[in-house]
Structure formats: structure tokens, C-alpha cells
Amino acid sequence: SATESRNYLKMTRLEESVFFAKEMGVKKVGIAFCIGLANEAHFCAQYFKNEGLDVQSVCCKVCSVDKDLLELEKIKPGQREAMCNPKVQARLLNEGGTELNFIVGLCVGHDMLFTMESKVPVSSIITKDRVLANNPAGAVYSRYWRRKLGILEEGTV
């Protein structure tokens, strides 16, 4: 609660994450990221490092195999497509001794598997939403999306 009370409307989520880690005495953090957000993960890691934290990061495609081997559905059938591996991401960060882990854009479901496998607390820095520029709250902020989703209430803007 100190993170919220001391920094309300003053810090971004990224800054609050560092503040929280330092308040908890954390020295080593992990970042589990989606390959599609590798640049964003890089900038998050750089900020953490600039703030004195040791950072380990693991891409979602670590130790992956082609989806054909497991007869998994593909986004583009007929093309090679590596599967994601959120449990191995968590295991590698566990082995690396991270004290707090952060998610940068893992898919729905993959984020849950990662969180279940992590031995330390997990928070999200970026939540993936391919339609809304990684801003899932846009679906409830936007009148268009509220109407499309059937949640636009009479008299609301």
C-alpha cells in the first residue's frame, strides 16, 4: 500500500515496480517477455538496471519446438511456428534466483502458466492486447468497443 499512497498519480507502473522492489529489499528481478515485445522488454530491463536492480530476462520461445511436432493449431498454417514455453520461462528465472518477476506481454493463458510456475511473486508491466496497442483497458474506455462488446449502457458516453 505504500507504493500506492506515496506515489499516487506521480509514478508510472514501471516506476512503481522499481519502487515496490526496492521497498521489499529485492535485488534481482526477472522479466518473462513475449518475443513480439522484445524491444519493450529491453527498455524495461534497462530502466531496472539503471535503478540498480540485477535483471534476468527470458523470451517466450525459449526451448521451443515447432507446433507441428505437437499438432498444435497455428496462426499461419503451413509455416514454421515455434510454440511458447511459459513454464520453462518461470523455471529458468527460478533457477536464476530472481526474487520478483515481471511479465511483459505474455499471451492470455501463458501469463497464468508462468505465474503458477514462478516460485516468487509476479506482476505485469505490459499486458498484451494486439488489437488495442497493448492497452486492454481501451475496451472499456472506448464507446465503440463497449457497444461492440454489448456493454454500452444507456446514457453513458
PLM regions with names:
Residues 1-28, 35-39:
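Electropositive, gly/pro-rich neighborhoods at or near active sites that engage anionic ligands
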Residues 23-30, 92-99:
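Short, surface-exposed connector motifs at secondary-structure boundaries
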Residues 40-47, 111-120:
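Short Gly/Thr/Asp-enriched flexible loops that form oxyanion-binding sites at enzyme active sites
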Residues 44-91:
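Long, charge-dense
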Residues 54-61, 117-135:
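Short, acidic/small-residue loops that bind anionic groups at enzyme active sites
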Residues 83-98, 106-109:
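A short, acidic, amphipathic alpha-helical segment used as a generic capping/interface helix at domain edges
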Residues 123-157:
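C-terminal functional extensions of proteins
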